[in-house]
Amino acid sequence: MTETQQKGPSAAEIRKLVERGQQGERAALEELYLIHFDRIYSYLHMTVGNRHDAEDLTTQTFMRMLESIGKFRFQSAPFSAWLFRIAHNLSMDHFRANKRWQPEEEVPEPHGSEERSAEDEAFQSIGRQSMLELIDSLSQEQQQVLTLKFVFNFSNAEAATILDKTEGAVKSLQHRALVSLQKQISGDKER
């Protein structure tokens, strides 16, 4: 989701906050933290599967933001995509260090969307546990693309930036993931 799609500050307001943050203005940095905290935490919680690690990685994400905000440039990607890229990289480092995913609890719903989408309807009809099992059968890259696209509503371009892939690769991963899920769901209904 781009900043203009959020029920929060506009892209221009985010830009001003980033510029003020780059000048070292503490209030602007705090505002950027408050605007992005819930989505970053939810993404990391969904990615690593437990609250403790998600909290640690969220803290590390915002620490990296503070350290690197001076290097951020508004060129091809919005600030939120840059911040999610930091979170994504930290989660990949976490996986390499721990070699496995350890879910321990339910993942919180990200804030923002109150309307039920087609994805929500499908999720309800299949059931939470069944859907989690289906998604778990996908590759890690496919899971990441679906999470960024359908949970966090990022565009293909933004997801590509976050995952350091081409837009075509993101479209391909999404397509293969959805085809795989569709085959699995169709197979389950036939039984």
What function would you assign to each model-found segment?
Residues 16-20, 130-138:
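Short amphipathic alpha-helical boundary/capping segments
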Residues 44, 96, 138, 143, ...:
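Short, Lys/Arg-enriched C-terminal cap helix and immediately downstream tail that follows
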Residues 34-38, 46-49, 136, 147-155:
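Short helix-capping/turn signature of helix-turn-helix
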